[in-house]
Protein backbone atom coordinates (compact mmCIF):
# COMPACT_ATOMS: atom_id res chain seq x y z
CA UNK A 1 0.00 0.00 0.00
CA UNK A 2 1.08 3.62 -0.64
CA UNK A 3 2.61 5.06 2.59
CA UNK A 4 1.19 2.19 4.61
CA UNK A 5 2.39 3.37 8.03
CA UNK A 6 0.92 6.86 7.61
CA UNK A 7 -2.33 5.37 6.29
CA UNK A 8 -2.61 3.03 9.29
CA UNK A 9 -2.01 5.92 11.72
CA UNK A 10 -4.55 8.22 10.06
CA UNK A 11 -7.15 5.46 9.94
CA UNK A 12 -6.48 4.75 13.61
CA UNK A 13 -7.11 8.41 14.44
CA UNK A 14 -10.40 8.47 12.52
CA UNK A 15 -11.57 5.29 14.26
CA UNK A 16 -11.61 7.30 17.50
CA UNK A 17 -14.29 9.48 15.93
CA UNK A 18 -16.36 6.47 14.97
CA UNK A 19 -16.05 4.96 18.46
CA UNK A 20 -16.71 8.20 20.36
CA UNK A 21 -20.04 8.61 22.15
CA UNK A 22 -20.26 12.27 21.12
CA UNK A 23 -18.09 14.65 19.15
CA UNK A 24 -16.93 17.39 21.52
CA UNK A 25 -13.82 19.57 21.79
CA UNK A 26 -11.94 16.94 23.79
CA UNK A 27 -12.58 14.25 21.15
CA UNK A 28 -11.55 16.57 18.32
CA UNK A 29 -8.33 17.53 20.17
CA UNK A 30 -7.46 13.84 20.69
CA UNK A 31 -8.02 13.02 17.03
CA UNK A 32 -6.03 16.06 15.87
CA UNK A 33 -3.16 15.12 18.20
CA UNK A 34 -3.07 11.62 16.65
CA UNK A 35 -3.13 13.11 13.13
CA UNK A 36 -0.30 15.49 14.10
CA UNK A 37 1.81 12.61 15.38
CA UNK A 38 1.15 10.54 12.25
CA UNK A 39 2.13 13.36 9.88
CA UNK A 40 5.25 14.38 11.82
CA UNK A 41 6.46 10.77 11.99
CA UNK A 42 6.02 10.64 8.20
CA UNK A 43 8.38 13.66 7.86
CA UNK A 44 5.72 16.20 6.88
CA UNK A 45 6.95 19.75 7.54
CA UNK A 46 6.15 20.92 11.10
CA UNK A 47 4.76 24.28 9.93
CA UNK A 48 2.37 22.56 7.51
CA UNK A 49 1.24 20.10 10.18
CA UNK A 50 0.57 22.76 12.82
CA UNK A 51 -1.31 24.97 10.37
CA UNK A 52 -3.47 22.06 9.24
CA UNK A 53 -4.13 20.97 12.84
CA UNK A 54 -5.34 24.42 13.81
CA UNK A 55 -7.67 24.63 10.81
CA UNK A 56 -9.18 21.20 11.56
CA UNK A 57 -9.87 22.20 15.18
CA UNK A 58 -11.43 25.53 14.26
CA UNK A 59 -13.58 24.14 11.47
CA UNK A 60 -14.70 21.10 13.48
CA UNK A 61 -15.92 23.26 16.36
CA UNK A 62 -17.31 26.23 14.40
CA UNK A 63 -18.76 24.84 11.17
CA UNK A 64 -22.19 23.26 11.24
CA UNK A 65 -22.41 19.89 9.44
CA UNK A 66 -24.10 20.12 6.01
CA UNK A 67 -27.64 18.78 5.75
CA UNK A 68 -27.75 14.98 5.95
CA UNK A 69 -24.30 14.67 7.52
CA UNK A 70 -23.66 13.79 11.16
CA UNK A 71 -20.83 15.40 13.22
CA UNK A 72 -18.51 12.38 12.83
CA UNK A 73 -18.79 12.42 9.04
CA UNK A 74 -18.33 16.19 9.08
CA UNK A 75 -14.99 15.96 10.92
CA UNK A 76 -13.75 13.17 8.60
CA UNK A 77 -14.74 15.37 5.65
CA UNK A 78 -12.73 18.27 7.10
CA UNK A 79 -9.65 16.05 7.55
CA UNK A 80 -10.02 14.88 3.94
CA UNK A 81 -10.30 18.45 2.65
CA UNK A 82 -7.32 19.73 4.67
CA UNK A 83 -5.10 16.89 3.46
CA UNK A 84 -6.17 17.76 -0.08
CA UNK A 85 -5.16 21.37 0.61
CA UNK A 86 -1.60 20.28 1.54
CA UNK A 87 -1.11 17.91 -1.39
CA UNK A 88 -2.86 19.92 -4.09
CA UNK A 89 -4.92 18.70 -7.02
CA UNK A 90 -2.15 17.04 -9.03
CA UNK A 91 -0.73 17.98 -12.42
CA UNK A 92 -2.86 17.96 -15.56
CA UNK A 93 -1.29 15.48 -17.99
CA UNK A 94 -2.35 16.18 -21.56
CA UNK A 95 -2.16 13.47 -24.19
CA UNK A 96 -0.65 15.55 -26.98
CA UNK A 97 2.80 16.11 -28.59
CA UNK A 98 5.20 17.50 -25.99
CA UNK A 99 8.79 17.62 -24.76
CA UNK A 100 9.51 16.70 -21.14
CA UNK A 101 12.74 17.34 -19.23
CA UNK A 102 13.52 15.13 -16.23
CA UNK A 103 15.59 16.51 -13.34
CA UNK A 104 16.42 15.19 -9.87
CA UNK A 105 19.03 13.96 -7.44
CA UNK A 106 21.23 10.98 -8.17
CA UNK A 107 19.57 7.84 -6.81
CA UNK A 108 16.06 9.32 -6.88
CA UNK A 109 14.84 6.85 -9.50
CA UNK A 110 14.90 9.45 -12.27
CA UNK A 111 16.27 7.23 -15.04
CA UNK A 112 13.81 4.41 -14.28
CA UNK A 113 10.96 6.94 -14.12
CA UNK A 114 12.00 8.33 -17.52
CA UNK A 115 11.49 4.94 -19.18
CA UNK A 116 8.25 4.28 -17.26
CA UNK A 117 6.91 7.72 -18.25
CA UNK A 118 7.57 6.98 -21.93
CA UNK A 119 5.79 3.65 -21.49
CA UNK A 120 2.81 5.47 -19.90
CA UNK A 121 2.37 7.69 -22.97
CA UNK A 122 2.73 4.72 -25.32
CA UNK A 123 -0.08 2.94 -23.51
CA UNK A 124 -2.21 6.02 -24.11
CA UNK A 125 -1.63 5.75 -27.87
CA UNK A 126 1.22 8.25 -28.36
CA UNK A 127 4.64 7.51 -29.87
CA UNK A 128 7.23 8.21 -27.17
CA UNK A 129 11.02 8.39 -27.33
CA UNK A 130 13.75 8.97 -24.76
CA UNK A 131 17.00 10.98 -24.97
CA UNK A 132 19.84 9.84 -22.67
CA UNK A 133 21.47 13.16 -21.68
CA UNK A 134 22.94 11.97 -18.37
CA UNK A 135 26.66 11.94 -19.17
CA UNK A 136 27.75 12.24 -15.54
CA UNK A 137 26.81 8.90 -13.97
CA UNK A 138 28.69 5.81 -15.17
CA UNK A 139 26.20 3.27 -16.43
CA UNK A 140 23.34 5.76 -16.95
CA UNK A 141 23.43 5.29 -20.75
CA UNK A 142 23.29 1.48 -20.54
CA UNK A 143 20.65 1.48 -17.78
CA UNK A 144 18.27 3.66 -19.77
CA UNK A 145 18.97 1.82 -23.03
CA UNK A 146 18.23 -1.54 -21.38
CA UNK A 147 15.02 -0.24 -19.78
CA UNK A 148 13.79 1.23 -23.07
CA UNK A 149 14.50 -2.01 -24.94
CA UNK A 150 12.63 -3.97 -22.28
CA UNK A 151 9.62 -1.65 -22.48
CA UNK A 152 9.79 -1.31 -26.28
CA UNK A 153 10.42 2.45 -26.08
CA UNK A 154 12.46 4.39 -28.67
CA UNK A 155 15.91 5.37 -27.36
CA UNK A 156 18.55 7.90 -28.42
CA UNK A 157 21.97 8.24 -26.83
CA UNK A 158 25.64 8.85 -27.65
CA UNK A 159 27.68 6.64 -25.35
CA UNK A 160 31.05 8.35 -25.85
CA UNK A 161 29.90 11.96 -26.11
CA UNK A 162 30.38 13.93 -22.83
CA UNK A 163 28.37 16.94 -24.06
CA UNK A 164 24.83 16.57 -22.65
CA UNK A 165 23.59 19.70 -24.43
CA UNK A 166 24.74 18.44 -27.84
CA UNK A 167 23.19 15.01 -27.17
CA UNK A 168 19.90 16.71 -26.31
CA UNK A 169 19.94 18.73 -29.53
CA UNK A 170 20.79 15.68 -31.66
CA UNK A 171 18.32 13.45 -29.82
CA UNK A 172 15.35 15.75 -30.27
CA UNK A 173 16.16 15.99 -33.98
CA UNK A 174 16.44 12.19 -34.30
CA UNK A 175 13.10 11.72 -32.51
CA UNK A 176 11.41 14.54 -34.42
CA UNK A 177 8.55 12.33 -35.64
CA UNK A 178 7.70 11.10 -32.14
CA UNK A 179 4.79 12.64 -30.23
CA UNK A 180 6.41 12.67 -26.79
CA UNK A 181 10.14 13.25 -26.32
CA UNK A 182 11.60 12.82 -22.82
CA UNK A 183 15.09 14.06 -21.92
CA UNK A 184 16.83 12.34 -18.98
CA UNK A 185 19.37 14.74 -17.44
CA UNK A 186 22.20 14.12 -14.98
CA UNK A 187 21.28 13.64 -11.34
CA UNK A 188 23.53 15.27 -8.77
CA UNK A 189 23.17 17.55 -5.78
CA UNK A 190 20.81 20.36 -6.74
CA UNK A 191 23.13 23.01 -5.31
CA UNK A 192 26.14 22.10 -7.49
CA UNK A 193 26.90 25.01 -9.81
CA UNK A 194 27.92 22.86 -12.80
CA UNK A 195 24.68 20.85 -12.62
CA UNK A 196 22.57 24.00 -12.49
CA UNK A 197 24.42 25.46 -15.49
CA UNK A 198 24.01 22.25 -17.51
CA UNK A 199 20.30 22.02 -16.66
CA UNK A 200 19.77 25.62 -17.74
CA UNK A 201 21.56 24.99 -21.05
CA UNK A 202 19.52 21.84 -21.76
CA UNK A 203 16.38 23.75 -20.83
CA UNK A 204 17.29 26.48 -23.35
CA UNK A 205 17.96 23.95 -26.14
CA UNK A 206 15.03 21.59 -25.50
CA UNK A 207 12.43 24.28 -24.70
CA UNK A 208 10.43 21.62 -22.81
CA UNK A 209 6.69 21.89 -22.28
CA UNK A 210 7.14 20.23 -18.88
CA UNK A 211 9.99 19.99 -16.39
CA UNK A 212 9.42 17.12 -13.98
CA UNK A 213 11.46 16.87 -10.80
CA UNK A 214 11.89 13.33 -9.49
CA UNK A 215 11.92 12.99 -5.69
CA UNK A 216 12.65 9.89 -3.63
CA UNK A 217 9.84 9.42 -1.08
CA UNK A 218 12.42 8.66 1.60
CA UNK A 219 14.41 11.89 1.20
CA UNK A 220 12.97 13.48 4.36
CA UNK A 221 13.05 17.15 5.37
CA UNK A 222 15.88 18.07 2.94
CA UNK A 223 13.41 17.59 0.08
CA UNK A 224 12.18 21.18 0.39
CA UNK A 225 15.66 22.69 -0.02
CA UNK A 226 16.40 20.55 -3.07
CA UNK A 227 13.01 21.27 -4.63
CA UNK A 228 13.47 25.03 -4.24
CA UNK A 229 16.93 24.84 -5.87
CA UNK A 230 15.62 22.95 -8.91
CA UNK A 231 12.59 25.22 -9.14
CA UNK A 232 14.70 28.40 -9.02
CA UNK A 233 16.99 26.99 -11.73
CA UNK A 234 14.61 25.75 -14.44
CA UNK A 235 11.08 26.25 -13.07
CA UNK A 236 9.51 22.93 -12.10
CA UNK A 237 6.07 22.26 -13.62
CA UNK A 238 5.46 18.87 -12.00
CA UNK A 239 6.83 16.36 -9.51
CA UNK A 240 7.26 12.59 -9.73
CA UNK A 241 7.56 10.90 -6.32
CA UNK A 242 9.27 7.51 -6.47
CA UNK A 243 9.56 4.57 -4.05
CA UNK A 244 6.24 5.53 -2.46
CA UNK A 245 5.54 1.98 -1.33
CA UNK A 246 4.57 0.62 2.07
CA UNK A 247 7.89 1.38 3.79
CA UNK A 248 8.29 4.98 2.64
CA UNK A 249 7.54 7.92 4.93
CA UNK A 250 6.95 10.27 2.01
CA UNK A 251 6.07 13.32 4.08
CA UNK A 252 9.22 15.24 3.14
CA UNK A 253 8.45 14.89 -0.55
CA UNK A 254 4.81 15.89 -0.02
CA UNK A 255 5.95 18.94 1.98
CA UNK A 256 8.28 19.98 -0.84
CA UNK A 257 5.39 19.76 -3.29
CA UNK A 258 3.24 21.95 -1.04
CA UNK A 259 5.95 24.59 -0.61
CA UNK A 260 7.01 24.88 -4.26
CA UNK A 261 3.39 24.75 -5.49
CA UNK A 262 4.53 22.34 -8.23
CA UNK A 263 1.78 19.71 -8.59
CA UNK A 264 2.47 15.98 -8.33
CA UNK A 265 2.29 14.42 -11.79
CA UNK A 266 3.07 10.73 -11.15
CA UNK A 267 3.95 8.39 -8.30
CA UNK A 268 6.07 5.25 -8.35
CA UNK A 269 4.85 2.53 -6.00
CA UNK A 270 7.00 -0.42 -7.05
CA UNK A 271 9.54 -1.87 -9.47
CA UNK A 272 7.41 -2.78 -12.50
CA UNK A 273 6.09 -0.40 -15.22
CA UNK A 274 2.57 -1.08 -13.89
CA UNK A 275 3.64 0.40 -10.54
CA UNK A 276 3.87 3.88 -12.06
CA UNK A 277 0.62 5.82 -11.68
CA UNK A 278 -0.74 9.18 -12.77
CA UNK A 279 -1.31 11.05 -9.52
CA UNK A 280 -4.92 11.73 -8.55
CA UNK A 281 -5.05 13.61 -5.23
CA UNK A 282 -8.58 12.56 -4.26
CA UNK A 283 -7.82 8.88 -4.88
CA UNK A 284 -4.51 9.15 -2.99
CA UNK A 285 -6.17 10.67 0.10
CA UNK A 286 -9.00 8.12 -0.14
CA UNK A 287 -6.47 5.29 0.05
CA UNK A 288 -4.68 6.89 3.01
CA UNK A 289 -7.95 7.25 4.92
CA UNK A 290 -9.07 3.68 4.16
CA UNK A 291 -11.78 4.62 1.65
CA UNK A 292 -10.09 2.62 -1.10
CA UNK A 293 -9.56 3.54 -4.74
CA UNK A 294 -11.91 1.47 -6.85
CA UNK A 295 -11.54 3.79 -9.85
CA UNK A 296 -7.77 3.16 -10.05
CA UNK A 297 -8.38 -0.56 -9.57
CA UNK A 298 -10.80 -0.62 -12.51
CA UNK A 299 -8.38 1.41 -14.69
CA UNK A 300 -5.55 -0.95 -13.77
CA UNK A 301 -7.73 -3.90 -14.75
CA UNK A 302 -8.69 -2.29 -18.07
CA UNK A 303 -5.04 -1.53 -18.92
CA UNK A 304 -3.70 -4.94 -17.87
CA UNK A 305 -6.41 -7.41 -18.85
CA UNK A 306 -7.78 -8.48 -22.22
CA UNK A 307 -11.30 -9.67 -22.98
CA UNK A 308 -9.97 -13.23 -23.00
CA UNK A 309 -8.78 -12.92 -19.39
CA UNK A 310 -12.23 -12.56 -17.86
CA UNK A 311 -15.60 -13.43 -19.43
CA UNK A 312 -17.58 -10.61 -17.82
CA UNK A 313 -20.84 -11.49 -19.58
CA UNK A 314 -20.72 -15.08 -18.31
CA UNK A 315 -19.90 -13.91 -14.78
CA UNK A 316 -22.81 -11.48 -14.71
CA UNK A 317 -25.13 -14.29 -15.81
CA UNK A 318 -23.95 -16.43 -12.92
CA UNK A 319 -21.89 -18.86 -15.03
CA UNK A 320 -18.62 -19.36 -13.19
CA UNK A 321 -16.70 -22.53 -14.00
CA UNK A 322 -13.29 -23.63 -12.76
CA UNK A 323 -11.95 -22.44 -16.13
CA UNK A 324 -13.27 -18.97 -15.32
CA UNK A 325 -11.69 -19.11 -11.88
CA UNK A 326 -8.35 -20.17 -13.37
CA UNK A 327 -8.47 -17.18 -15.74
CA UNK A 328 -9.40 -14.93 -12.82
CA UNK A 329 -6.35 -16.07 -10.82
CA UNK A 330 -4.10 -15.47 -13.83
CA UNK A 331 -5.66 -12.03 -14.34
CA UNK A 332 -5.02 -11.06 -10.71
CA UNK A 333 -1.42 -12.13 -11.11
CA UNK A 334 -1.08 -9.82 -14.14
CA UNK A 335 -2.39 -6.84 -12.16
CA UNK A 336 0.39 -6.99 -9.59
CA UNK A 337 0.98 -8.04 -5.98
CA UNK A 338 -2.13 -9.02 -4.03
CA UNK A 339 -1.33 -6.51 -1.28
CA UNK A 340 -1.29 -3.62 -3.77
CA UNK A 341 -4.63 -4.66 -5.27
CA UNK A 342 -6.24 -5.05 -1.84
CA UNK A 343 -5.04 -1.58 -0.77
CA UNK A 344 -7.34 -0.11 -3.44
CA UNK A 345 -10.42 -1.65 -1.81
CA UNK A 346 -12.31 0.32 0.86
CA UNK A 347 -11.61 -0.69 4.47
CA UNK A 348 -13.96 -3.54 5.22
CA UNK A 349 -13.45 -5.10 1.78
CA UNK A 350 -9.67 -5.22 1.35
CA UNK A 351 -9.18 -5.08 5.10
CA UNK A 352 -11.43 -8.01 5.94
CA UNK A 353 -14.01 -6.06 7.89
CA UNK A 354 -11.54 -3.44 9.09
CA UNK A 355 -8.89 -5.94 10.27
CA UNK A 356 -5.70 -5.32 8.28
CA UNK A 357 -3.88 -8.35 6.94
CA UNK A 358 -0.21 -8.88 7.79
CA UNK A 359 2.49 -9.41 5.16
CA UNK A 360 2.60 -13.08 6.20
CA UNK A 361 -1.15 -13.45 5.61
CA UNK A 362 -0.87 -11.81 2.18
CA UNK A 363 1.97 -14.18 1.30
CA UNK A 364 0.00 -17.19 2.54
CA UNK A 365 -2.98 -16.12 0.42
CA UNK A 366 -0.77 -15.65 -2.66
CA UNK A 367 0.76 -19.10 -2.11
CA UNK A 368 -2.72 -20.61 -1.80
CA UNK A 369 -3.77 -19.04 -5.12
CA UNK A 370 -0.70 -20.58 -6.81
CA UNK A 371 -1.60 -23.92 -5.21
CA UNK A 372 -5.12 -23.70 -6.62
CA UNK A 373 -3.71 -23.21 -10.13
CA UNK A 374 -1.45 -26.25 -9.71
CA UNK A 375 -4.46 -28.36 -8.68
CA UNK A 376 -6.52 -27.15 -11.65
CA UNK A 377 -3.63 -27.98 -14.00
CA UNK A 378 -4.23 -31.63 -13.06
CA UNK A 379 -7.92 -31.55 -14.02
CA UNK A 380 -9.46 -32.56 -17.33
CA UNK A 381 -11.20 -30.08 -19.65
CA UNK A 382 -14.51 -31.73 -18.71
CA UNK A 383 -13.88 -31.26 -14.97
CA UNK A 384 -12.84 -27.62 -15.42
CA UNK A 385 -16.11 -26.94 -17.27
CA UNK A 386 -18.36 -28.90 -14.89
CA UNK A 387 -16.95 -29.18 -11.31
CA UNK A 388 -19.97 -31.25 -10.24
CA UNK A 389 -18.34 -34.24 -11.94
CA UNK A 390 -15.51 -34.24 -9.41
CA UNK A 391 -16.24 -36.98 -6.86
CA UNK A 392 -14.07 -39.03 -4.50
CA UNK A 393 -12.12 -41.04 -7.09
CA UNK A 394 -11.43 -37.97 -9.23
CA UNK A 395 -10.28 -36.03 -6.17
CA UNK A 396 -7.72 -38.79 -5.44
CA UNK A 397 -6.49 -38.70 -9.05
CA UNK A 398 -6.21 -34.88 -9.06
CA UNK A 399 -4.43 -35.03 -5.70
CA UNK A 400 -1.80 -37.46 -7.02
CA UNK A 401 -1.31 -35.49 -10.24
CA UNK A 402 -0.87 -32.12 -8.52
CA UNK A 403 1.14 -33.29 -5.53
CA UNK A 404 -1.45 -31.74 -3.21
CA UNK A 405 -3.54 -33.44 -0.55
CA UNK A 406 -7.20 -34.48 -1.15
CA UNK A 407 -8.16 -31.92 1.54
CA UNK A 408 -6.57 -29.14 -0.54
CA UNK A 409 -8.52 -30.26 -3.63
CA UNK A 410 -11.76 -30.18 -1.61
CA UNK A 411 -10.82 -26.74 -0.27
CA UNK A 412 -10.43 -25.49 -3.85
CA UNK A 413 -13.85 -26.84 -4.82
CA UNK A 414 -15.39 -25.19 -1.76
CA UNK A 415 -13.71 -21.87 -2.64
CA UNK A 416 -15.09 -22.11 -6.18
CA UNK A 417 -18.61 -22.71 -4.87
CA UNK A 418 -18.31 -19.71 -2.52
CA UNK A 419 -17.16 -17.48 -5.40
CA UNK A 420 -19.99 -18.73 -7.60
CA UNK A 421 -22.57 -17.91 -4.92
CA UNK A 422 -21.06 -14.45 -4.34
CA UNK A 423 -21.12 -13.58 -8.06
CA UNK A 424 -24.76 -14.60 -8.30
CA UNK A 425 -25.45 -12.22 -5.44
CA UNK A 426 -23.81 -9.31 -7.31
CA UNK A 427 -25.71 -10.02 -10.54
CA UNK A 428 -27.91 -7.10 -11.53
CA UNK A 429 -26.75 -4.93 -8.64
CA UNK A 430 -24.61 -1.81 -8.65
CA UNK A 431 -21.93 -2.42 -6.04
CA UNK A 432 -19.83 0.71 -5.45
CA UNK A 433 -19.09 1.11 -1.77
CA UNK A 434 -16.51 3.84 -2.36
CA UNK A 435 -18.99 6.00 -4.25
CA UNK A 436 -21.53 5.57 -1.45
CA UNK A 437 -18.95 6.53 1.20
CA UNK A 438 -17.82 9.64 -0.67
CA UNK A 439 -21.38 10.70 -1.41
CA UNK A 440 -22.21 10.30 2.27
CA UNK A 441 -19.24 12.48 3.24
CA UNK A 442 -19.96 15.08 0.56
CA UNK A 443 -16.59 14.61 -1.19
From Swiss-Prot:
SUPFAM superfamilies: Domain of the SRP/SRP receptor G-proteins (SSF47364), P-loop containing nucleoside triphosphate hydrolases (SSF52540), Signal peptide-binding domain (SSF47446). InterPro entries: AAA+_ATPase (IPR003593), P-loop_NTPase (IPR027417), Signal_recog_part_SRP54_M_sf (IPR036891), Signal_recog_particl_SRP54_hlx (IPR013822), Signal_recog_particle_SRP54_M (IPR004125), SRP/SRP_N (IPR036225), SRP54 (IPR022941), SRP54_GTPase_dom (IPR000897). It is an enzyme of class 3 (hydrolase). GO terms for biological process: SRP-dependent cotranslational protein targeting to membrane. GO terms for molecular function: 7S RNA binding; ATP hydrolysis activity; GTP binding; GTPase activity. Keywords: Cytoplasm, GTP-binding, Hydrolase, Nucleotide-binding, Ribonucleoprotein, RNA-binding, Signal recognition particle. CDD domains: SRP54_G. GTP binds at residues 104-111, 184-188, 242-245. One of its GO terms (cellular component) is signal recognition particle. It is found in: Cytoplasm. Its main location: cytoplasm. The keyword Ribonucleoprotein applies. The keyword Transport does not apply. Pfam families: SRP54, SRP54_N, SRP_SPB. Its EC number is 3.6.5.4. It catalyses: GTP + H2O = GDP + phosphate + H(+). Signal peptide: none annotated. Part of the signal recognition particle protein translocation system, which is composed of SRP and FtsY. Archaeal SRP consists of a 7S RNA molecule of 300 nucleotides and two protein subunits: SRP54 and SRP19. Belongs to the GTP-binding SRP family. SRP54 subfamily. HAMAP family: SRP54 (MF_00306). Composed of three domains: the N-terminal N domain, which is responsible for interactions with the ribosome, the central G domain, which binds GTP, and the C-terminal M domain, which binds the RNA and the signal sequence of the RNC. Involved in targeting and insertion of nascent membrane proteins into the cytoplasmic membrane. Binds to the hydrophobic signal sequence of the ribosome-nascent chain (RNC) as it emerges from the ribosomes. The SRP-RNC complex is then targeted to the cytoplasmic membrane where it interacts with the SRP receptor FtsY. This is Signal recognition particle 54 kDa protein.
Amino acid sequence: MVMEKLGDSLQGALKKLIGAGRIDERTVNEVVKDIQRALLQADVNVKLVMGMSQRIKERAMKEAPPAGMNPREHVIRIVYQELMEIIGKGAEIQLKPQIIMMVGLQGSGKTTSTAKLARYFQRKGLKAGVVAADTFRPGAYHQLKTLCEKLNVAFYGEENNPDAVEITRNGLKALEKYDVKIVDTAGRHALEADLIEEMEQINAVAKPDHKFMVLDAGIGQQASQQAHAFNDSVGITGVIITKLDGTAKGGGALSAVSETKAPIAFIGVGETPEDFEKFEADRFISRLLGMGDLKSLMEKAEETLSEEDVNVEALMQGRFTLKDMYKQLEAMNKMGPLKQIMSMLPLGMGGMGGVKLSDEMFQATSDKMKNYKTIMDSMTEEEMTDPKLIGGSRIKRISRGSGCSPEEVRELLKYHKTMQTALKGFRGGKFNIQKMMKKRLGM
